[in-house]
Amino acid sequence: MADSQTQLLVLGGGPGGYPAAFEAADHGLQVTLVDEGAQPGGVCLNRGCIPSKALLHIAKLINETRESADHGLSFAPPKLDLAKLREWKNTAVVGKLTGGIRELCKLRGI
């Protein structure tokens, strides 16, 4: 591993850490961002708030289709494919957001 120098070490790549690192880098500091996970975003983005809200969104959609019968629009009962649902949550939601943070880090030299 090569020796490197940093002016600011930010511990934690969650919703407090990465914005702080971005702000410092935008002001010309050489920043290193350290996070325990392989993906930036911390617990909230990777396995907490954001994935939970994505799954709650699906639950809301299912409920709305049931309630639409009151307005004359009905659907067949939903069929959940848990493997596809998890894949969507992991790639289209979490993967897209962590990828965006990773790219923003690269652009700023973090």
Place the predicted regions along the sequence by residue.
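Beta1/beta-strand and adjacent pyrophosphate-binding region of the FAD-binding site
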Residues: 2-16
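The conserved SAM/SAH-binding core of class I Rossmann-like methyltransferase domains
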Residues: 11, 34-35
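Glycine-rich flavin
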Residues: 2-5, 23-29, 35-110
